[in-house]
């Protein structure tokens, strides 16, 4: 359990202030061995599905690997766990607590009226908009913040800045970049107007002032 708590702190808890954790963290954290849950099949039989890393149930966060298996977790495993945990924390639990006032400059870059019509689809990336067709400007702003947060915490800077158009098979990176939804988004070939990089810098600064270093989370366990 000691080793398990150590990696939970390193990949998750240590990246948030005590105030944020006290305010938004689940009421109970359980360090378990193997977390599984069951669901009924069409035949009414019970099927068991293993949750490899963690589960959030009834305001309780339950972690697996409370035994010797924690020693077998690879960097790839830890990178995946890290992404899932921080996406849950930063794009679900903390949404209502985002530092909105500090994000005004970030939100001023994009003309959100263009996110409401597919007629502007070809302009979206130039506007710094990474989402899909929005229902309203307010909804677009909320989605925009969450999308940038997800991009930064799940994608190392090296992958964000890579020129995906210059990589082809059999370059080993050809397969690596396929694991990253946001690969190349900060490269000029995709960020043609520089607005994605501009918004990247603004949201990183706003969240850092808030006490969360998004790029540090993005680099964690990246090889």
Per-region residue spans from a language model:
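Metalloprotease/metallohydrolase-associated module, dominated by Zn2+-dependent proteases
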Residues: 110-223
